[in-house]
Regions:
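Carrier-protein-dependent adenylate-forming modules in NRPS/ANL systems
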Residues: 1-91, 138, 163, 167, ...
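Adenylate-forming
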Residues: 23-31, 36-45, 55-59, 74-79, ...
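Short, highly charged C-terminal tails/helix-capping segments
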Residues: 366-378
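Internal, well-ordered interaction modules that form the hydrophobic cores of assembly/scaffold domains
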Residues: 377-380, 441
Length: 561
């Protein structure tokens, strides 16, 4: 068997540059055709401090693997200090043994009695009609192709919250993970993600203790679907999560990649299939690194990448006596769609939501307050401060001011007809004078029964210029509805055209715009702007402008002025 050695590169650094150096090498991209999937860098920060960065490709190791890898490193260092070869304990199994065992466990999917077939069928049912994409509160639209650039915001829950989570978990026969999953799902639902919240979660996949000390990729990803419908209490939501998760854990052997092949969801280069939010609870054993002559401390590493839109990565801490000491971690987010400030606020919202629901688990999740006082004030007052100073001028005057500014600009386009502001204004002035001559003015109504057209805009403006209020009537209304509206509103006249098809009651006073006599009178009328001296009363913002009648679905139509 040909042995391969991992590349180890020695570099100089200093305290100002070390964080950037670590981040840079952590994002190393392996060429798996020519490189082994493990690489290391040793940075000399100063005479007394060095930083070792080991990067393992996921094909060769998972998060759990870092423990045995660190222990093997400590054994090797101690041996080399003594000038001897490392005396590693032989492993009971190799990764190849695991792959053969898994293949044997799943069996043939074509065999309906096999474990693989039954688990695939479970996931077909469990994930039926799952949302293709979770509508999260993005800061910008998702790109067509994801860049996978990411960042992390720290997340920490104090001892009080940790105790509350543990207590509720024990009370409901659930795990800490399940309580946190319910909290994340409740938050996302409150932020507009809907009532069906799929969350991806890794499982260690080491179902035999013989695998505990083996470096390799055993992790599988489960899609945990959280039902937040019906406004449940948080306690009820935890119970729902518990039932869903226990079912899913019983079918955790089918690889996620195989599920994607079988379920064949709508694919996109811009997002992850089946879920876009992940929740990981780190419970791998932590190894204390002991190396002769060295003080060793494990530090955080980051790749600057994000596989999902959001990934909540958490871990519990305990005191030496086993007492809860807090839950900490971070929210990894895709910078394609989120700003850091949004995720910082989200971390605060999750903390406040947990504090609220732990204090009263029977409280519906919809009633848990998640906003800070300043945020609540912004929502209730700042964004609702819609007061604006309005001009004292009425619509006809405002329109005439626009005519003065852009007389030849296009004002109306309809069915191939284009009219400028000047044309609309002059024709409306003529019709307004005709209406005033027939008694139109403030506190009077003029009904308009015309199809949608450029002419309709002129008519409505003319009624307003006269000082009267218009009553719109759809020519397609039933005759009895039209009769009722006219009887209730009592307009001085109905403006219409000959081909409108409207059925008006006998004796209704009407103005037919396309009647030759009307056309002649309009042509002989002045087109300049009207003055209050010509009107029966002054225009003002306190006189009626129009009357809209309700549908009448619950009785008779009612006019709203």
């Amino acid at each position: 068997v040909e042995e391969a050695a991992a590349a180890v590169e020695l570099r100089k650094s200093d305290r100002e540059r070390i964080s950037a150096d670590v981040e840079s090498v952590s994002a190393y991209a392996f060429d798996l055709q020519s490189e082994i999937p493990l690489r290391a860098w040793l940075f000399e920060v100063d005479a007394d401090d060095s930083v070792l960065v080991a990067v393992v490709h996921h094909i060769a190791g998972d998060g759990w693997s870092l423990g045995p890898l660190a222990r093997d490193l400590a054994v090797a260092y101690a041996a080399r200090c003594e000038g001897v070869a490392p005396g590693w304990e032989p492993l009971p199994v190799q990764y190849a043994d695991y792959t053969l065992w898994q293949r044997e466990l799943l069996g043939d999917e074509d065999d309906s009695e096999s474990v693989g077939a039954s688990q695939v069928e479970f996931w077909r049912r469990e994930l039926a009609d799952i949302p293709d994409e979770l509508p999260l509160p993005f800061d910008r639209s998702r790109p067509v192709v994801a860049s996978y650039a990411g960042d992390v915001v720290e997340l920490a829950f104090d001892v009080r919250v940790h105790r509350g989570v543990l207590g509720l978990a024990r009370e409901r026969g659930a795990s800490v993970f399940m309580v946190m999953q319910a909290a994340v799902a409740a938050l996302l639902s409150r932020l507009g993600a809907g009532e069906d919240i799929p969350i991806g979660s890794p499982v260690a996949g080491r179902l035999d203790e013989a695998l505990d000390d083996l470096v390799g990729f055993f992790v599988n990803t489960l899609v945990l679907r959280t039902d937040v419908s019906g406004d449940p209490s948080f306690a009820e939501l935890v119970e729902r999560v518990r039932e869903t998760d226990l079912r899913a854990f019983g079918a955790q052997d089918v690889p996620f990649e195989r599920l994607v092949e079988v379920l064949n969801p709508v694919r996109s280069m811009g997002r992850h299939p089946l879920f876009q939010v992940a929740l990981a609870f780190q419970n791998a054993p932590v190894s204390d690194l002991v190396m002769p002559g060295l003080e060793v401390e494990a530090g955080p590493g980051g790749t600057g990448a994000a596989k999902f839109d959001l990934s909540f990565n958490l871990a519990e801490s305990f005191t030496g006596s086993g007492e809860p000491a807090g839950i900490s971690g971070g929210i990894e987010f895709a910078t394609d769609v989120f700003d850091r400030s949004t995720i910082e606020r989200m971390a605060g919202w999750l903390t406040r939501l947990l504090e609220q629901v732990l204090a009263d688990p029977q409280r519906p999740v919809s009633r848990a307050r998640i906003l800070e006082d300043t945020e609540l004030d912004q929502v209730l007052k700042g964004w609702n401060d819609t007061h604006r100073a309005t001009p004292g001028a009425v619509l006809p005057v405002l329109f005439e001011a626009q005519v003065a500014r852009t007389p030849d600009a296009v004002a109306v386009v309809c069915d191939g007809v284009e009219l400028s502001y000047r044309e609309v204004n002059e024709r409306a002035n003529r019709l307004a004078r005709l209406l005033i001559g027939q008694g139109a003015g403030p506190e009077r109504f003029v009904a308009v029964a015309m199809p949608r057209s450029a002419e309709l805009v002129i008519v409505l403006l003319a009624v307003l210029k006269s000082g009267a209020a218009y009553v719109p009537i759809d020519p397609d209304y039933p005759a009895d509805r039209i009769a009722y509206i006219l009887d209730d509103a009592d307009p001085m006249a109905v403006i219409t055209v000959g081909n409108s098809g409207v059925e008006l009651p006998a004796g209704t006073s009407r103005i037919l715009l396309d009647e030759p006599g009307t056309v002649a009178r309009l042509a002989a009328t002045g087109a300049e702007n009207l003055t209050d001296a010509e009107r029966l009363g002054s225009l003002g913002g306190d006189v009626p402008a129009y009357v809209i009648f309700t549908s009448g679905s619950t009785g008779r139509p009612k006019g709203v002025v």
